[in-house]
């Protein structure tokens, strides 16, 4: 569980640096994924 929190923190800091979450990274809710990706099933996946 602690590892997950650290991981979430890293992703959150990535998002604040890039302004979006890189593809294939974990995301929550309607987080903004980079490029043509959307947050699906907890990950940034290509928009189908």
UniProtKB/Swiss-Prot annotation:
Q: Does the keyword Secreted apply?
A: yes
Which organism was this protein described from? Answer: Platymeris rhadamanthus
Signal peptide region = 1-19
Which tissues and organs express this gene's product? Expressed by the venom gland.
What UniProt keywords are attached to this protein's entry?
Answer: Calcium channel impairing toxin, Disulfide bond, Ion channel impairing toxin, Knottin, Neurotoxin, Secreted, Signal, Toxin, Voltage-gated calcium channel impairing toxin
Known function:
Binds reversibly and blocks P/Q-type voltage-gated calcium channels (Cav).
MF GO annotations: calcium channel regulator activity; toxin activity
Tell me the disulfide pairings in this chain: 20-34, 27-39, 33-44
Q: Where in the cell is it found?
A: Secreted
What is this protein's record name?
A: U-reduvitoxin-Pr5a
Q: Which family does it belong to?
A: Belongs to the venom Ptu1-like knottin family.
Please state what the annotation says regarding this protein's domains.
Answer: The presence of a 'disulfide through disulfide knot' structurally defines this protein as a knottin.
**GO cellular component, as recorded:** extracellular region
Q: Does the keyword Amino-acid biosynthesis apply?
A: no
